[in-house]
Amino acid sequence: MVAAQAKLVYHLNKYYNEKCQARKAAISKSIREVCKVVSDVLKEVEVQEPRFISSLNEMDNRYEGLEVISPTEFEVVLYLNQMGVFNFVDDGSLPGCAVLKLSDGRKRSMSLWVEFITASGYLSARKIRSRFQTLVAQAVDKCSYRDVVKMVADTSEVKLRIRERYVVQITPAFKCTGIWPRSAAHWPLPHIPWPGPNRVAEVKAEGFNLLSKECHTLAGKQSSAESDAWVLQFAEAENRLQLGGCRKKCLSLLKTLRDRHLELPGQPLNNYHMKTLVSYECEKHPRESDWDESCLGDRLNGILLQLISCLQCRRCPHYFLPNLDLFQGKPHSALENAAKQTWRLAREILTNPKSLEKL
């Protein structure tokens, strides 16, 4: 048994050093190419409208606010200033979303975003995004990369297609630090010793973002109040949870396997599903020794089996907001197909670790 485990870990490490590192290098190169263009577009936006200031800065070889959706798809979060005159309200009526309401006694004129406040005093995510989309469309025509970049049509999101190869979504957002949403108040679960009080304090201090984007849980039934709502996102908090042991390596393996074998019709699975399942696996195996290098095979296998279970149940709860289903709106046939493919992949890796050389 120990010999079989060691063999699997050996082949996973080999796969990581060859395939995962190659994937990372290729994505880093793509990110540099994409960020040059996006920075130029955002510089042009700022000239037209100084309230939209580019926050796409490189720090320690990574760009703040940039998320990799897939090797050719990225999201750039554009942090806006001056949320201060609004109260953050998440009463759970819109899973995964919250609203920003003008604080009592505050005049509209005190806000930097006065013309985007609705009659009921809410700061409208949709109105801000609509204005931003117009500005980006104008900037694309003026910027120095205009020959290689164009807007993606037929969406209320701000999406750019670059060199016919990459798609980048630029999402206006507010950063919320020092507060924690009520809809995530149950976390951490009291009977689970992971992630420990110090890490919990770090994660909660990191806070979350409020994004102006279409909320998929409301697709097809968006009333005006709902389209004014902001989507909760915990990217930095989630990144903190992946620190230590072989967690990041495990996630890197899962992303690479997804890119190579689970990029399927209907796009049932993305990198975020993998990241979410790593967090759940950490709860199931709370001891640091469970994430030792020697346990890499067990952890990967556990996550793949959990993924199959989620696909078969057609439900993958968000880690911090369990009422939010990350498979919402995905075609059932696509989820079934993904379950079969994941099962084949898991069986192949477990019964014949050497097959990783071809995967």
UniProtKB/Swiss-Prot annotation:
It is found in: Nucleus. One of its GO terms (molecular function) is nucleotidyltransferase activity. Keywords: Developmental protein, Magnesium, Metal-binding, Nucleotide-binding, Nucleotidyltransferase, Nucleus, Transferase. A ribonucleoside 5'-triphosphate binds at residues 23-24, 63-66, 248, 252-255. Its EC number is 2.7.7.-. Mg(2+) binds at residues 73, 75. Putative nucleotidyltransferase required for several aspects of embryonic development including normal development of the eye. It is unclear whether it displays nucleotidyltransferase activity in vivo. Binds single-stranded RNA (ssRNA). This is Putative nucleotidyltransferase MAB21L1. It comes from Xenopus laevis.
